Swiss-Prot record:
Belongs to the ATPase alpha/beta chains family. It catalyses: ATP + H2O + 4 H(+)(in) = ADP + phosphate + 5 H(+)(out). GO terms for molecular function: ATP binding; ATP hydrolysis activity; proton-transporting ATP synthase activity, rotational mechanism. It is found in: Cell membrane. This is ATP synthase subunit beta. It is an enzyme of class 7 (translocase). The keyword Iron does not apply. Coiled coil: none annotated. Produces ATP from ADP in the presence of a proton gradient across the membrane. The catalytic sites are hosted primarily by the beta subunits. HAMAP family: ATP_synth_beta_bact. InterPro entries: AAA+_ATPase, ATP-synt_VA_C, ATP_synth_F1_bsu, ATPase_a/bsu_AS, ATPase_alpha/beta_chains, ATPase_F1/V1/A1_a/bsu_N, ATPase_F1/V1/A1_a/bsu_N_sf, ATPase_F1/V1/A1_a/bsu_nucl-bd.
Length: 484
């Protein structure tokens, strides 16, 4: 066990208490007065249910007084009864770390789900509750992480060593986009990746496992899952388990790490459930009163230190498409780039359904990405914004009533909107179209040509779901051939 893990180890390790009350996943345990376990300590008990013996793990959440502690169970509490003995492990939950975790799936407790535990050759075990790196060790980064997706690279460039949020309501393509990022970035990145499945569908976890195996990136990836059917305590802690594995690669092995989290909203939701179970007074919209603090404890650990980085991509569900909801609103402050997915764009069949006007990036600045890239991005946004302002007039009077200048703006905006769509590798099984990777140089050249009017003669359809300008020309040639 590392020094970090032993920081929390109480002198009362091995102390035994007895269950006093069970209310769903919340368990009150009575310990001897001189052996009260510390907050965050892991407790264990063994029970027999239907002839099968299983170990249940709890995490200490509150000291109630009168020698009672309140703990949250990380497994189903079926079969637990009052009077059952509970043992204090003397430390928080620990998970295996090191090269031995690559290529395997783990649960929140660090137990492998794909192989026997004896097959995991861990370098060490680290506690999941750790301090964020000291301020003096942090290192800012402005290096662009190229994804090969036009709309992202042009308008919301990602930062190597930064935190990236993929925001969107239900069914607009968050999980597909994060899977696409795993396929693209992890494959080109060549480093270590860690994936945290927080409160999402088990089917998606299985799909991800298969896709990563096919893409050849599984051998360099550790996956940690706490899915929808798990108790709230598990869903609240699984992101910390995955992050701890990523921190080991960053701090001990001095590697650059990719951390994918799907979904941060489920982390917040689990915190809300746990908060209610612990009897705390809810805050705005029913969320936990310590929402900002809880989010900060996670996000402040996802950072880059001198010489090595954690680049994080986080899917964030937006309930009812309401960006003022406290859960997504609290996350915004921690991110370096935000990619907002639009239901209106998705309804037009344009994927990835990134909203070019609301998505942002800290490095969308000429000193970081160059003048040509910046100027093209600004021109694209100006054309799209002008087109948006003209939509009310078009809806009432029609396009014919616009001035010639405005007609040109609308025409180019429609081509830009189509050209922002792109065929992806993940969606090939649905579309039958091979994915494409477009270099940032080709992306800037393509959109510059549209803004300059060099492609005004090309039909809009030729820009739909293609890669670079070469694909546009091929599509245009096909369309001309078909109309002869």
């Amino acid at each position: 066990m590392t020094a970090t893990a032993t920081e929390h180890v109480a002198a009362t390790s091995g102390a035994t208490g007895r269950i006093a009350r069970v209310i769903g996943p919340v368990v009150d345990v009575e310990f001897p007065a001189d052996a009260i376990p510390s907050i965050y300590n892991a407790l264990t008990t063994e029970i027999t249910l239907n002839g099968e013996t299983k170990t249940i793990t709890f995490e200490v959440a509150l000291h109630l007084g009168d020698n009672l502690i309140r703990a949250i169970s990380l497994q189903a509490t079926d079969g637990l009864v009052r009077g059952t003995n509970v043992v204090d492990t003397g430390s928080p939950i620990t998970v295996p770390v090191g090269d031995g975790v690559k290529g395997h799936i783990f649960n929140v407790l660090g137990k492998p789900l794909d192989v026997d535990e004896s097959e995991i050759q861990a370098s060490d075990h680290w506690a999941i509750h750790r301090k964020a790196p000291a301020f003096a060790t942090l290192e800012g980064s402005t290096e662009m992480l190229e994804t090969g997706i036009k709309v992202i690279d042009l308008l919301t460039p990602y930062i190597k060593g930064g935190k990236i949020g993929l925001f969107g309501g239900a069914g607009v393509g968050k999980t597909v986009l994060i899977q696409e990022m795993i396929t693209r970035v992890a494959r080109n990145f060549g480093g270590t990746s860690v994936f945290a499945g927080v409160g999402e569908r088990t089917r998606e976890g299985n799909d991800l496992w298969v896709e990563m195996e096919e893409a050849g990136v599984l051998k360099d990836t550790a996956l940690v899952f706490g899915q929808m059917d798990e108790p709230p305590g598990t869903r609240l802690r699984v992101a910390l388990s995955a992050l701890t594995m990523a921190e080991y690669f960053r701090d001990v092995q001095n590697q650059d790490v990719l951390l994918f989290i799907d979904n941060i909203f489920r982390f917040t939701q689990a915190g809300s459930e746990v908060s209610t179970l612990l009897g705390r007074m809810p805050s705005a919209v029913g969320y936990q009163p310590n929402l900002a603090d809880e989010m900060g404890l996670l996000q402040e650990r996802i950072t880059s230190t001198k010489g090595h980085s954690i680049t994080s991509m986080q899917a964030i569900y937006v309930p009812a498409d309401d960006y003022t909801d406290p859960a997504p609103a609290t996350t915004f402050a921690h991110l370096d780039a935000t990619t907002e997915l639009s239901r209106e764009i998705a309804s037009r069949g344009l994927y990835p359904a990134v909203d070019p006007l609301t998505s942002t990036s800290r490095i969308l600045d000429p000193q970081y990405i160059g003048k040509d890239h910046y100027n093209t991005a600004v021109r694209v946004k100006q054309i799209l914004q002008k087109n948006k302002e003209l939509q009310d007039i078009i809806a009432i009077l029609g396009v014919d009533e616009l001035s010639e200048e405005d007609k040109i703006v609308v025409s180019r905006a429609r081509r830009i909107q189509q050209f922002l769509s792109q065929n992806t590798y993940t969606a090939k099984q649905f579309t039958g179209v091979e994915g494409s990777t477009v270099s940032i140089k080709d992306t800037v050249e393509g959109f510059t040509a549209i803004c300059d009017g060099e492609l005004d003669h090309v039909a809009e359809q030729a820009f739909f779901n293609v890669g670079g300008l070469d694909d546009v020309e091929r599509q245009w040639a096909k369309i001309q051939e078909q109309t002869k």
